[in-house]
Regions:
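A cross-taxon signal for low-complexity, glycine/charged-rich
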Residues: 1, 7, 12-14, 29, ...
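N-terminal glycine-rich phosphate-binding loop and ensuing alpha1 helix
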Residues: 39-108, 139
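Structural beta-sheet core signal
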Residues: 45-47, 93, 166, 191-194, ...
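Well-ordered alpha-helical segments embedded in enzymatic catalytic cores
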Residues: 78, 150-154, 251
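Conserved beta-loop-beta/alpha segment of the NTase-like Rossmann-fold superfamily
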Residues: 102-208
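Catalytic-core segments of class I nucleotidyltransferases/pyrophosphorylases
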Residues: 163-165, 172, 176-185, 197-202, ...
Length: 297
């Protein structure tokens, strides 16, 4: 996760109740993706899922980082459930490194979440206890070496003309996405980033006379950093030159200089999965039954 130097000046956090405009579809009229009859239309969520995960290579050698599992489900699934809990069901996934693993997962989704019976003689398959999510997922090959900005530019044709969500495929939070969207719309900006305080990564030694008398977990950081969970206008694509553009550098810095970038301060839980230690910590939280990011029922 790259820290961005970006907080827009003198922006006050204002949270209001969500109005009916949140339900407007971000899908253009000529887009082939259609919402099923009776299905709630939602803002699109774009998830960056093309990275190699070099700092957690033990887990990402054969699969992309967003497919590393927590509790038997890819972290990508957990992120999508966070959005789904807020009524967001339309996803665009930016694939890259071993993107076919992500495509295969969704192509065989029922095989992962349901019991099935195969009648070999009749060449039939029966799915039991269907656990289908109300999701519409567009998987886009954005290149193995494409930078974060370039990946967004490559999926621009799927974004329509409305504001959309964007986040990284390796970070979890208990963020109120409806409040985030309302905050963004109240600021009259092109982009809003969720700012978070980084979790402590190293234990602090308490010593007395050269002897360790206690070990305390390092407290949460005090500086605000880029935590992902953006809300963006499609106009931000104009700030991206091409595949080589790093979203967290030139585009965000330009938006900040122009006063078009807001920061939504999230004081709650946020944790990236950058290392094997992070993965084990998140796995422990999930196994305890008290995972803070589990905002769905």
């Amino acid at each position: 996760m790259i820290q961005a130097k970006l907080i827009a000046p003198s922006l006050q956090r204002r949270i209001h109740s969500l109005d009916s405009s949140v339900g407007r579809s971000a899908v253009p009229a000529n887009d082939k993706r259609r919402h099923r009859k009776g299905e709630q239309q939602t803002v699109i969520a774009v998830i960056l899922a093309g990275g190699k995960g070099t700092r957690i290579s033990e887990e990402s050698y054969l699969r992309p980082k967003p497919m590393i599992e927590l509790g038997g489900k890819p972290i990508l699934w957990h992120i999508m459930k966070i959005y789904s809990a807020a009524g967001v069901y339309d996803f665009v996934i930016c694939c890259g490194y071993r993107g076919y693993v992500i495509k295969s997962y969704f192509a065989n989704y029922f095989m992962h979440v349901c019991d099935v019976t195969f009648d070999i003689a009749r060449n039939q398959m029966q799915v039991h206890q269907s656990a289908a999510e109300p999701w519409k997922v567009t998987l886009v090959d954005t290149g193995e070496e494409t930078m974060t900005g370039g990946r967004k530019k490559r999926v621009a044709k799927y974004l329509g003309t409305e504001d959309f969500f964007l986040t990284y495929g390796d970070g979890l939070a208990d963020i109120d996405l409806k409040a985030l969207l309302e905050f963004h719309r109240a600021q009259n900006v092109l982009a809003t980033v969720t700012s978070v305080r980084p979790p402590g990564r190293f234990g602090a030694l308490v010593t007395d006379g050269g002897r360790v008398i206690n070990i305390r977990e390092k407290p949460q950081g005090t500086s605000w950093i880029n935590g992902g969970f953006f809300v963006l206008s499609p106009k931000v694509i104009n700030y991206i030159q091409g595949d080589h553009t790093v979203w967290e550098v030139d585009p965000l810095e330009s938006l900040a200089r122009e006063g078009k970038l807001a920061a939504y301060e999230h004081e709650g839980f946020w944790h990236p999965m950058d290392t094997l230690r992070d993965k084990n910590q998140l796995e422990g939280l999930w196994g305890s039954g008290k995972a803070p990011w589990k905002v769905w029922t």
